[in-house]
Amino acid sequence: MSRIRQAFAALDGGKALIPYITVGDPDIRTTLALMHGMVANGADILELGVPFSDPMADGPVIQRAAERALANGISLRDVLDVVRKFRETDTQTPVVLMGYLNPVHKMGYREFAQEAAKAGVDGVLTVDSPVETIDPLYRELKDNGVDCIFLIAPTTTEDRIKTIAELAGGFVYYVSLKGVTGAASLDTDEVSRKIEYLHQYIDIPIGVGFGISNAESARKIGRVAEAVIVGSRIVKEIENNAGNEAAVVGALVKELKDAVR
């Protein structure tokens, strides 16, 4: 059983908290400290952003984080090194990479999949890879035991949902809002209806992200989805608390986890 499946099974019907940070923001040492701190405060799965120069799906908060990481020279290989170092002391917590196809394409799908598996990556989500064209990367990930994680948006067609249901591993990431990460208004009733609809086709957990910024919104989403994904709020706390990132983010993660139990 994969680490992601084990993580959901261990919750025994409880809901997973999946926090997101950008690797290398503000630096590699802090990234590792944040990863361990988030796990210590209740994170069930970690989502690591791979910095990219044109993060079209991300709002201004995560865009700035990517810019800071790129200014530090962070590459995809550095991201894999971070996971490798994390695995030296944590072999249980699943790690998912979230990013864009270009850096993966540059490395080569086979080499990336092999190196990701060796480093201890459990899942990969490339936000700009339509399900219709992802087959070459999907095959390499599958051959190396790494889950291919897909986004589903409010506008995703039924045919595409069916295709994703056949291919997806780990969990499916439902984008609760149209637009970019960090967007504001969240209609939990609409999300609930959509999750119920998606589970007609999808039999693995569904995580909801975009627009979840506090314990109250996390609690509401936790009532209807198997996982709650929080990114922009955490990245904003990192941006606003230089030198004290791990403590502030740890406290926020604990608050969020307490809300979704």
Swiss-Prot record:
InterPro entries: Aldolase_TIM, RibuloseP-bd_barrel, Trp_synthase_alpha_AS, Trp_synthase_suA. The active site is at E47, D58. One of its GO terms (cellular component) is cytosol. The keyword Amino-acid biosynthesis applies. Pathway: Amino-acid biosynthesis; L-tryptophan biosynthesis; L-tryptophan from chorismate: step 5/5. It is an enzyme of class 4 (lyase). GO terms for molecular function: tryptophan synthase activity. Tetramer of two alpha and two beta chains. This is Tryptophan synthase alpha chain. The lineage of its organism: Bacteria, Pseudomonadati, Pseudomonadota, Betaproteobacteria, Neisseriales.
